[in-house]
Amino acid sequence: MKVIEPSSNPTKGITEKIDFGAMFPLQLDNSLTDLDKIKTLIVGGGQVNPKLVEKLQNVSTQVYETYGMTETLTHVAIKPLNGPSKSDVFRALDDIHFELDARECLVIHATALNPEPIVTNDLVDLIDENSFRWLGRYDNVINSGGIKIIPEVVEAKLSSIVPNRRFFIAGKSDKSLGEKVVLVVEGKSMDIS
């Protein structure tokens, strides 16, 4: 076992091969040039953005995004981000299963971790009781003229159109729609083609 001081680039200075590691998305992004030092890596603590997933397609390290929260004490599902098993679907770990509540938010059943079902605010496309596709947060939904828009879904689709800029989708009050969708892009000017 190798313990490393907390850093935004945990692979810096590592010379030996590591069988298994864990990072946050920021650490992963900063470690891409040395990632081949790690055989298998889990990434958690935040969503891995699509541009970073693209960068992972040519690395030898098998990288998995984890899904979990404080209430589960650990991750409860994983999805492969690269390699032949790459997927956009999270799969439950052993002895864990899922369902939806009335809001279409994920409910986690992990009795070894918590005897009560854990109700989340995560909107998901539930594929079956063991797998789901994460869509976004219930708290972020924009209701525009009665249509519920999940900002995270729109942002994922725009990520290839808005290159090299940080951006987000937000709701803004509108007299006729209730809320309208607004794209906020960092920077002074932009050319979208």
PLM region spans:
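Gly/Ser/Thr-rich phosphate-binding loop
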Residues: 35-85
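Structural motif
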Residues: 20-22, 42, 184
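Ser/Thr-glycine-rich phosphate-binding loops at phosphate-binding pockets of nucleotides
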Residues: 24, 68-72, 120, 144
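AMP-binding/adenylate-forming core of the ANL superfamily
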Residues: 97-125, 182
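Short beta-strand-to-turn element immediately C-terminal to the catalytic PLP-Schiff-base lysine
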Residues: 77-81, 101, 186
